[in-house]
Amino acid sequence: MFFAVITLFPEMFEAITAYGISGRAAKRDIVQVTCINPRDFAEGNYRRVDERPFGGGPGMVMMAEPLAKAINHAKQLASQAGCVHVPVVYMSPQGKTLNEQAVQQFVDYDGLIVLCGRYEGVDERLIQHYVDQEWSIGDYVLSGGELPAMVLLDSIIRRLPNVMSDEQSAIQDSFVDGLLDCPQYTKPDQFEGLDVPEILKSGHHANIEKWRFLQRYQRTLERRPELIEKVALTKQQKKWLSDEQG
């Protein structure tokens, strides 16, 4: 999958390309992550990419022209890589909140061009002409779009085929089927007086599966009750709940 990131701080994305699951995916050429600095497309000796906002106010606004040139360059790179469906995504507090359903849709794209804002944001005309989607990672403000962009890339990359060493691990993550994940345990059997639930050591896979589902359901009910209404339970899961409640 192809990713082009428009950012004033390309070095930050070594966290994606050099470490962990996403780093291994990059080394195996499952993903291609290219960072494009809009300063390279700015004019003048100082390569300015920001100016004061019309109408006054604090801070600076990223200028449309260097960003547009950077996006067009990213589109050329995507085309050269054989990618057809490559939306331009702007990471913004005004965007829709990123969730697992959106991530799974991104996986079907050939790639993404991700625009990272800075300062007070970017010129609205750039958004109107070049941005296909705006996404947020939550109702809070960060110094720029780089960290949200890394969240987006990491969440997509780990969903791609052949990236995870254990595909089942990705399937069982929180939110994949609408429920939170179940409690996890590893050695030793006892830690500070707390024991691993005996059922997890029983070797009875059907009982373990049932226990994990019930734990996930109860945890979601307690911590994120608004998610329960959207969960599509299987026939077996409904039976487990009925047995437990009745």
UniProtKB/Swiss-Prot annotation:
GO terms for molecular function: tRNA (guanine(37)-N1)-methyltransferase activity. The keyword Lipid metabolism does not apply. This is tRNA (guanine-N(1)-)-methyltransferase. GO terms for biological process: tRNA N1-guanine methylation. S-adenosyl-L-methionine binds at G117, I137, G138, D139, Y140, V141, L142. Its EC number is 2.1.1.228. It is an enzyme of class 2 (transferase). The keyword Transferase applies. Keywords: Cytoplasm, Methyltransferase, S-adenosyl-L-methionine, Transferase, tRNA processing. HAMAP family: TrmD.
